[in-house]
Swiss-Prot record:
Coiled coil: none
UniProt lineage: Bacteria, Pseudomonadati, Pseudomonadota, Betaproteobacteria, Rhodocyclales
PANTHER family found in the cross-reference section: UPF0234 PROTEIN YAJQ
Stored CDD domains: YajQ_like
Record-stated family: Belongs to the YajQ family.
Gene Ontology annotations for the cellular component aspect, listed alphabetically: cytosol
Protein's recorded name: Nucleotide-binding protein AZOSEA28950
Organism: Aromatoleum aromaticum (strain DSM 19018 / LMG 30748 / EbN1) (Azoarcus sp. (strain EbN1))
Amino acid sequence: MPSFDIMSEVDLPSLKNAVDVANRKISGRYDFKGSDARVEQGEKVLTLFGDSDFQIDQMRQILLPEMTSKKIDVRCLEYGDLQKIGGNKLKQELKVRVGVEQDLAKKIVKLLKDSKLKVQAAIQGEAIRVSGAKRDILQEAIALVKKEITDFPLQFGNFRD
């Protein structure tokens, strides 16, 4: 029985590369001279440090195109609130969402069941396994999910015949 997986993954080495390039651009910009503006990468979080909300906004405008050029979908970022960290320094955390969250997975499974396509969908951890009788039905399921779920980056892989 043919099947495929719906998942959401981020290429972490490409993300690190994008952060490094953004930091080089930030350190070379005139309007950031003398400030402690930088982007730090944690396990699944990016932290922007700056002197003002304007600087943090400018750093986002540098970082996001770098991520796009490295083929990282920026919809995987969840923006945190601006936080004061002593003096006139600010930070903002950008959480990198990896894996399909449970509520989104349930929404996708419900979407596939309500579509009357002859497919079975099962949540398997941070991925969704979709199986059907024919490859054509699976392709229709992919098209349906791509059309309906636009606010979160999804990848379709692990095809089996």
